[in-house]
Amino acid sequence: QGLAELERRVGVPLFERHGRHTRLRPQATEVLAHARRVVAETRDLARWAETRRTGAAGVVRLGTIDAVAVHYRAEAIRRHRRAVPGLDLRLTVAPSGALFDALLVGDLDLVVCVEPTGPIAGVAMSPCLDESLYAYAPDGAHGRPPEEWGPWVTYPRGSHTREVIAAGLAALGAPFAVVAESNQPEVLREMVRLGMGWAVLPAAQAEAGAEPLARVRRRPVGVRHLVVARRADVVSDAAVDA
């Protein structure tokens, strides 16, 4: 019945009977070759669909702040790339504000950044980790009470981290007179070493390298909360979820 249906659909006699046996006609060779290609391509499609369903392939556009990409999740990112070689993981490192902007316009699928002070419409966030921020001073300036701290080198206006720092210093009664700005913690660290000002930084970046900065006090000035964020209105993607 199946062979008869195939002949009917193709419109060309494909088989002939020889006694009890059915044989392919010569003109059926091309049809058979085509059928084999279709079966192979169908299997390829099934394998592709399986990798998409399980997250073993596809494109993931991940955005993170520098501390996440360099210090906290660098090994996890490398391990995931090795474990899922079919995944095209594209990493963007930028400040939190720029990452949220890129997420909202669809340029990124997932971001790991500093939690904003309030909710952002259309964005779903979940906790990632908490990061303590400590005060650091140039050589010879340690030992002062908070009222005499500064001046400061810090993140630019609009930075989520700067908002955390400003609130923490205000709670301590420390002035927040800013003399220089940079989005890069490593640059701020070098400014402190050069004596340009004080800074509040994550320990992972301030105390790294051959010449680590020394904390002004053991307790942190503040804590910034890092979150994993994605657009709330997008269809679930196994590669992103992984």
What are these regions (language model features)?
Residues Q1-E5, A76:
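Residues within the DNA-recognition helix of helix-turn-helix
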Residues R9-V10, V31-R53:
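Alpha-helical linker/hinge and terminal dimerization helices associated
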